[in-house]
């Protein structure tokens, strides 16, 4: 089993027209942290995962997963 945590952070951020900086300020982290999360270079702490889910008003499992998310686009 892979230890990677997959997320939809970039997708949700783009849907709402948010910059990394704006999202980072809203949840109290450095904007670089958002980039690290989006690229999978860093896994969010439970506290940060909960803050991000609350900000986007989605369940944590809609934002983060142990399994890759299915593509939203059909091939």
Task: Give residue spans per PLM region.
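Short alpha-helical DNA-recognition segment
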Residues: 17-36
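DNA major-groove recognition helix of helix-turn-helix/homeodomain DNA-binding modules
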Residues: 47-62
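Alpha-helical residues within the helix-turn-helix
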Residues: 14, 25, 54
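Short, charged recognition helix plus adjacent turn
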Residues: 54, 64-75
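A short, Lys/Arg-rich alpha-helix, primarily the initiator
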Residues: 1-15
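Short, conserved catalytic or interaction motifs in soluble domains
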Residues: 39, 58, 68
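Residue-level signal for the short linker/turn that defines the boundary of a DNA-recognition helix
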Residues: 7, 17-18, 44-47
């Amino acid at each position: 089993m892979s230890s990677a945590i997959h997320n939809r952070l970039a997708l949700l951020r783009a849907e709402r027209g948010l910059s990394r900086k704006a999202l980072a300020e809203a949840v109290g982290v450095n904007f670089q942290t958002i980039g690290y999360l989006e690229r999978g270079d860093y896994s969010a702490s439970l506290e940060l995962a909960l803050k991000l889910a609350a900000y986007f008003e989605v369940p944590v499992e809609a934002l983060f997963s142990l399994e890759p998310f299915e593509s939203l686009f059909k091939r």
